[in-house]
Amino acid sequence: DIDKSCNGLVELPAEEKHGILWVHPDPNGSFDLEAQLGELAAEFDSWGFEKYVFQGNTIFEHQMNWKLAIDTFGETYHFNTLHRDTLAKDFHGNCQMYDRFERNHRMMLCLKNIDNLRGQNAEECNVLHACLPVYYIWPNVQLIMGLNGPTLVRVYPEHANPNKSFSRISFFLAP
């Protein structure tokens, strides 16, 4: 048992589902997770997030509004120019798939390795060898599914300045 009166601890509405702990930031708030995720709920189940082990996290501070920080991850056309020595080596910068699920969306960033998979039976291929799925869960969460495990990005506004934000990035690996 924990004495919640110590250290300003406040109980928040939470639900553990799809291998993820979902928390509402308002102690008086509520949420309907299945309604929030919609069609993505079944897809999240298929990834088996519960099997991955937390490895640590890092925080990045941004000199931009949190909404801009979220939106700037929404395209890949700039990879070939701005990231030619890094991301452009692994990704086709002019190709991605985009699906919208109410307020959420999913992007599939096309890996150059997809070229090596042409002609193979799609049922025998691991989708993670062809692309990088990136989920945006409204309003501030990005979930990136990589070959080694998921990366969870949460972007928050800086309370004192709406022109600043920070990202808390958590890394998970298969045991």
Predicted region positions:
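C-terminal catalytic domain of Rieske-type non-heme iron oxygenases
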Residues: 12-16, 20-175
